[in-house]
Curated annotation (Swiss-Prot):
Keywords: Hydrolase, Leucine-rich repeat, NAD, Plant defense, Repeat. The active site is at E84. One of its GO terms (biological process) is defense response. Pfam families: C-JID (PF20160), LRR_3 (PF07725), NB-ARC (PF00931), TIR (PF01582), WHD_ROQ1 (PF23282). Residues 9-173 form the TIR domain. Its EC number is 3.2.2.6. This is Putative disease resistance protein At4g11170. It catalyses: NAD(+) + H2O = ADP-D-ribose + nicotinamide + H(+). GO terms for cellular component: mitochondrion. GO terms for molecular function: ADP binding; ATP hydrolysis activity; NAD+ nucleosidase activity, cyclic ADP-ribose generating. LRR repeats lie at residues 609-631, 632-654, 655-677, 679-701, 702-722, 723-744. The TIR domain mediates NAD(+) hydrolase (NADase) activity. Self-association of TIR domains is required for NADase activity.
């Protein structure tokens, strides 16, 4: 609901009434009372009543602060009144119009349920009206009657009630919210969300929680809410800093609660000397009062028990709002209505910063890039944005540039003070977990943290993570990833720095590059150090580590020497160490060392505690000899260790789930011990150019992802797992996959691009994606592909010897066949209405094949992705065609107001690449053209001939016509096309356009003078129908032949699928007959002429 304070009001009150019931009695006295009190009321005496309310009445409702709805017995007999009520309730929702129902000699229940005499009048009014209009009236009546109003049974006399209504109106007018919070970015959305949770007009007592991290704006939202609505309650209180008021020294739990209640009631009732002697005081004083209570910054469940233990403590329609960092506190108090305050968007954050830095919503041009950097530095936290913005206000560009590096390394004092409150409230083990995440592990998965962090058990870590999440100190995503806000990470680093300000070697974690280099070079590390995280890109000079550097760091658990910039193999390594430099690290769980400079690990290295070994781009030739105790190892990453010749024995690494050996160009074979990796999920072997040998007959039951890209010497694929989901064999010398592949039950994708495949014999039944690009020796695609029910994408581009493509299953949604130079025949039609086709440079496609492609393009529901195929002219089924790159259609040819969906066709000239296309739609009254972009295909070679490019568009968003548009309908539509690519862009030689029905889904949803059936285009001649039936019979008869071939190629396990497909082929002919009959009716043909072909 938008804030009403932003409106320009003309009236205080808009009355809605049935004149014959109240105009000359009750209403006249009420209006006179309003006038005497200075209440400006809208009068409709001069307006002529009709069946619908006009623009003048709608404007009056929207320009009023309050609407008084006088329900009377005949109110519902007027469609005018009912439409008026709909508009009133709409304004209530959209702009905060206050609605006061008055029930004049009518029961609210009759209005709510449309019963009694009121209901009878309503039913008479509904006669002849649409269902939608009746539904809207009922909803408005019910919603309005649910608002608490004045019932005639509660009136002593009319004169007294008129005075009471007048008084209530004045109170509501005086309660108009101030503008103190109008300029706060995003506040309108926050208030709208809170209003939906509070349900201010509903009965009963409701408690709503606002939770989120410190500094995100919870208190500000609560204050804005209080400011807007406190006048609507008998009593109201904003009790700030509840956390601080609950720590009086020398008091027990009972005494603290008494003290808190006394402070609360004293402020609420404005009685300074009030004394509370028992914990029932709040209930005694407030059980009959409608109160608004804001409890700000609550951090202890006992505080809630003291101030709002039970809903029955408060009167009907009371509302309590609790702000806290701790979600679990709200859950523990059974508060089910909660609002989590999110960080502002990038644009909102920049606006907040600029309001405080420049006193305007956007930065000056010379400081724009710095303002964006400061906004990023603040991590979009509103508190930090306000503090940093105020700090930089009035300073010159040089001061901005000077301040940025300092603020990056140190928290502002005010921001730190606010954020540290949440940290200080943690238990010791939770603080320890917080520091681990802040310094080392932000962005990691929850399971990873359980493996890495030393604790009594996994549950201990899980519980701690949940506490941190509930207190808004971390964010847990659905996929298990753990994130900590940048300012909270900075807080954690500051806490660690203060552990030993002048001796970094005595801190828990080392992260600052300069300080870390000092500790390493001077050998000042101690047993306190648990982790080191050093970005080697920040090392200024070459750093030499001695043999004794790690000697005193006997408790070091995490060693992370990483490079934040891309690693170049020619890059000079600035960190050097002796051969025995790692011999003193028996507790290591994480060893991450990019570009490790030695060829071997020292002989004394003991990796028994290692969970992750990450040595990408290392100089390693060999890790170690013999069998090492690797029982805890989960991840081994040796990616781009180009000198690695041999992998160690991994028989003890039974928990390993990720093994990355990509770009290990000297590696010749995998050890036979790999068979022990029963928990291995990913095996990455891409670009292992010398790899020739993989152990055979091993079954890794957990293996799901397998990459052998560009293992150019690998000729055979081993029987390695039956649970693989992704198999990547790009650029290998493999000629075929093993027979067992057809039994794989989990495989989604097989990619054999640039392999040596000669024939495809075995394909899994559950396959979804099949890539066979650039297999130049491949000549045939097996017919049994049409029986793969999940197959969605096929890519046979650059398979230059493929002559025909078999019938494909209806599940296929993308077929790419670029530069298939020999492709001539397509068996079967493309039945998926959302399929995308790319036949660039398939110049030998026969006429029948092209007809099938055109049929698919004609009937399918496309998107902005274009279908491309050879062709010289726009097909005839595009009703509007033109030479050149634009087309104009006048309204005397078609009613342009009815259509927002189009199919377009371009003829692209030969000799250039298709790099995408810009399309602009001009209508007569568009302020500017609607622009769309047809993206280029991932593979778009030089066009060897003219090509057709076809796709579908919808002009978005559609809008109801304005009065001007109704009086001046569109007279033309112009569409222009311009291909992209600069000097090398394709020429648009012709273009065509076809209007589409808005939501029609049948094959005839296109408005065309032609009818397309079964592969041909027909007009009014029966001979065309005969040709179509012949085509379809030919197609159907080929089904049985294909089934015979498929039966020879398939195992007996596929028989049921084949029989099912045969039945589908039989049913298809019946479907075609039905299409013919429908088409004949559309063309005005007699069904008698169809009998010879439809028997």
């Amino acid at each position: 609901m938008a804030s009403s304070s932003s409106n320009s009001w003309r009236y205080d009150v808009f009355p809605s009434f049935r004149g014959e019931d109240v105009r000359n009695n009750f209403l006249s006295h009420l209006l006179k009372e309003f006038e005497s009190k200075g209440i400006v009321t809208f009068r409709d005496d001069h307006i002529k009543r009709s069946h619908t309310i006009g623009h003048e009445l709608r404007a009056a409702i929207r320009e009023s602060k309050i609407s008084v709805v006088l329900f009377s017995e005949n109110y519902a007999s007027s469609s005018w009144c009912l439409d008026e009520l709909i508009e009133i309730m709409k304004c209530k929702e959209e702009q905060g119009l206050k609605v006061m129902p008055v029930f004049y000699k009518v029961d609210p229940s009759d209005i709510r349920k449309q019963t009694g005499k009121f209901g009878m009048s309503f039913l008479e009014t509904c006669c002849g009206k649409t269902e939608e209009r009746q539904h809207n009236w009922r909803r408005a009546l019910t919603d309005a009657a649910n608002i608490l109003g004045d019932h005639p049974q509660n009136w002593d006399n009319e004169a007294y009630k008129i005075t009471t209504i007048s008084k209530d109106v004045l109170e509501k007018l005086n309660a108009t919210p101030s503008r103190d919070f109008n300029d706060l970015v995003g506040m309108e959305a926050h208030i709208a969300k809170m209003e939906s949770l509070l349900c201010l007009e509903s009965q009963g007592v409701r408690i709503v929680g606002i939770w989120g991290p410190a500094g995100v704006g919870k208190t500000t939202i609560a204050r804005a809410l209080y400011n807007q609505y406190h006048e609507n309650f008998n009593l109201s209180i904003f009790m700030e800093n509840v956390r601080e008021s609950y720590g009086e020294a020398g008091l027990d739990d009972y005494g603290l609660k008494l003290h808190l209640q006394q402070r609360f009631l004293s402020k609420l009732l404005d009685q300074k000397d009030l004394r509370v002697r028992h914990l029932g005081a709040i209930e005694e004083r407030l059980k009959s009062q409608k109160v608004l209570i804001i409890l700000d910054d609550v951090d202890n469940i006992e505080q809630l028990k003291a101030l709002a233990k039970e809903n029955q403590w408060f009167g009907n329609k009371s509302r309590i709002v609790v702000t806290t960092q701790n979600k679990q506190l709200l859950v523990s108090h059974d508060i089910n209505h909660m609002y989590q305050v999110a960080y502002p968007s990038k644009q909102e954050a920049l606006t907040i910063f600029c309001q405080h830095a420049f006193k305007q919503s956007s930065p000056s041009d010379d400081l724009k890039h710095l303002a964006i950097e400061f906004t990023t530095l603040a991590g979009h936290l509103p508190l930090a944005l306000r503090v940093l913005g105020s700090f930089m206000r009035g300073k010159g560009k040089e001061e901005w540039e000077f301040s940025l590096p300092t603020l990056k390394s140190r928290l502002d004092g005010e921001v730190e003070k606010v954020l540290k409150v949440g940290y200080d409230g943690l238990h010791d083990h939770e603080k320890d977990l917080f520091l681990h995440i802040a310094c080392i592990f932000s962005g990691q998965h929850e399971n990873y943290l359980k493996q890495m962090i030393i604790a009594n058990n996994d549950t201990y870590v899980s519980f701690g993570l949940q506490v941190l999440a509930d207190k808004s100190l971390i964010q847990k995503f659905e996929n298990g990833r753990i994130e900590m806000h940048s300012l909270l990470r900075q807080l954690g680093k500051e806490v660690v720095r203060k552990q030993s300000i002048y001796e970094p070697g005595k801190r828990q974690f080392l992260m600052n590059a300069k300080e870390t280099c000092g500790v390493l070079s001077n050998n000042t590390g101690t047993g306190t150090v648990l982790g080191i995280s050093l970005d080697m890109c920040e090392i200024k000079e070459e750093l030499y580590i001695s043999e004794k550097t790690f000697e005193e760091m006997r408790n070091l658990v995490y060693l992370k020497f990483y490079m934040s910039s891309p690693i170049d193999d020619k890059m000079k390594v600035k960190l050097q160490l002796p051969e025995e430099g790692l011999s003193y690290l028996p507790q290591l769980r994480l060893l991450h060392w990019d570009a490790y400079p030695l060829e071997f690990f020292p002989s004394s290295f003991r990796p028994e505690c290692l969970v992750e070994l990450n040595m990408s781009h290392s100089k390693l030739k060999k890790l170690w000899s013999g069998v090492q105790p690797l029982r805890n190892l989960r991840t081994m990453n040796l990616n781009s260790s180009r000198n690695l010749e041999i992998l160690p024995n991994l028989m003890e690494a039974t928990k390993l789930n990720r093994l990355d050996l990509g770009w290990c160009e000297s590696l010749v074979e995998l050890p036979s011990s790999i068979k022990n990796l029963q928990h291995l999920i990913l095996l990455e072997m891409s670009c292992c150019k010398k790899l020739e040998i993989i152990p055979t007959n091993i079954n890794l039951p957990s293996l799901e992802v397998l990459h052998f890209r560009y293992c150019t010497r690998l000729q055979t694929f081993p029987e390695i797992s039956t649970n693989i989901r992704l198999l990547n064999l790009i650029g290998t010398a493999i000629t075929e996959v093993p027979p067992s592949v057809k039994y794989w039950s989990k495989i989604d994708e097989i990619c054999m691009e640039r392999a040596k495949v000669k024939r495809l014999v075995h394909v899994p039944y559950v396959l979804e994606k099949l890539c066979l690009r650039e297999n130049k020796e491949l000549e045939t695609i097996p017919r049994y592909l049409k029986y793969l029910p999940r197959l969605q994408m096929i890519d046979i581009s650059y398979c230059i010897n493929i002559i025909s493509l078999p019938k494909l299953p209806g599940s296929v949604s993308a077929l790419t066949a670029v530069n298939c130079e020999s492709l001539q025949i397509l068996h079967g039609h493309f039945r998926n209405k959302s399929i995308h086709l790319n036949f660039i440079n398939c110049l030998k496609l026969g006429q029948r094949a092209q007809e099938k492609i055109h049929r698919s393009v004609y009937i399918h529901q496309s998107s902005y992705i274009a279908d491309v195929l050879p062709g010289e002219h726009v097909p005839a089924y595009f009703s509007y065609r033109s030479t050149g790159s634009s087309i104009m259609i006048h309204s005397n040819k078609v009613d342009l107001s009815k259509f927002n969906r189009f199919k377009v066709c371009l003829v692209l000239g030969a000799g250039k690449r298709f790099e995408g296309c810009d399309i602009k739609f001009y209508k007569q009254f568009f302020c500017k053209p609607r622009e769309y972009y047809v993206p280029k295909h991932l593979d778009s070679p030089l066009l060897k001939s003219d090509h057709l490019c076809m796709c579908e568009f919808e002009l978005m968003p559609p809008h109801p016509p304005t009065e001007w548009e109704l009086l001046h309908p569109n007279e033309f539509l112009e569409v222009s096309f311009e291909s992209r690519g600069g000097l090398y862009k394709c020429e648009v030689k012709e273009c065509g356009l076809q209007f589409l029905e808005p939501h029609e889904t049948s094959e005839f949803r296109y408005l065309s003078p032609h009818l397309y059936l079964g592969g041909s285009w027909i007009g009014n001649s029966s001979s065309s129908i005969e040709e179509i039936i012949h085509v379809d019979q030919e197609e159907s008869s080929s089904d049985s032949e294909e089934i015979i071939y498929a039966d020879q190629e398939e195992s007996s396990s596929g028989i049921e699928e084949i029989i099912h497909a045969e039945r589908e082929g039989t049913n298809r002919r019946k479907s075609v007959m039905r299409w013919i009959k429908v088409g004949a009716r559309k063309m005005g043909l007699s069904l008698e002429c169809l009998k010879p072909w439809t028997r």
